[in-house]
Amino acid sequence: MSSTLSVAKAASTPVKQITSAVGPVKESPGNWKHPRLAEITRRQSRNIFGEKNVRQIVYNVAAIVLLEIFRVFASPSIPSQLILPSLRPYSLWIHAVFLVIPLTNIVIALLPLFRPVDDLSDIPLTPAQRKLLGLPPSSKPATPNSVYSTPPRYSRTPSLAGSPASIKSYTSSTLPTASSPTPGAAGIGAGSPAAPIYLSPSKFTTSTSSQQFSPSPSGASPLLHRAISNTSTASGVSPYGSPNSPSKFGASTNSTLAASTISTSTFSVSTTSSIAHVLNNSRLRESVIEGVPATPTPVGKGASVKANSKWLYQRGRRTSSNNWVY
């Protein structure tokens, strides 16, 4: 029999022990309350005449009215056989007891209007606590053995939120400067015309001056190659000068015959370089106005432009006359 009971106990479902997950509440300035706050609230509510008191008075007055209606209209119609003969002499006393109960409740509900105000002088409260509770300052001096209950105090660490150092560091870390590039200026293209442009004068100088015309064997026109080759064959001078002393146009400046022969081709070269220079400057100006980075086109790859300007023609003649001086 005992073995059967032990097997039944082992087969029974174990009961899960429910442990309280809420630990003891530590006192802190955020959740602290006065240890005698419940007593203070109860004693203060005794002097408050509110909605609860009014409701209590109304209900008890209604009960008195119903008792009087029952006594006047219902008691004569009750047969005397239903009332015990021993209770007939006490019928008036029974009616009076039923009337005393609602009258007592009405008097209790009216007591806050006549009860003196409790100043809670027997409870040790600081002046700040009395002010928060709406109590007048205590007229009695504090007893030597009174212990005031106050919230725990913690040392406050100074905040650097409004200090000049924090404002300075925030300004230096967030505001962009003129030297630091902005995200909008990192990649400027045709798809973003409203992006700001950061260009220095040195970039303009480099882009315009680096595209000077230099008649090299790969970039010059075939007519220039032919003119230089014929001149060098007739004078016996290398068409592009010696490696140690290269000249501007590829011919030696000491040879008068080479200079006179090249003067014919110089006009076309100078005219082409002037046109390319004017085109580069106009494209650079348009690119700065439109917000697109300048991409000057080299002379050898530029579009062919008909030079019909009188100014370009006169400039070419002056260049050719200067070459004849040498």
Curated annotation (Swiss-Prot):
It holds the Pfam family NPCC. One of its GO terms (biological process) is protein import into nucleus. InterPro entries: Nucl_pore_cmplx. Residues 171-187 have a biased composition (Low complexity). The chain crosses the membrane at residues 57-77, 94-114. One of its GO terms (cellular component) is nuclear pore transmembrane ring. Residues 140-149, 156-170, 232-247 have a biased composition (Polar residues). Keywords: Membrane, mRNA transport, Nuclear pore complex, Nucleus, Protein transport, Translocation, Transmembrane, Transmembrane helix, Transport. This is Nucleoporin POM34. It comes from Chaetomium thermophilum (strain DSM 1495 / CBS 144.50 / IMI 039719) (Thermochaetoides thermophila).
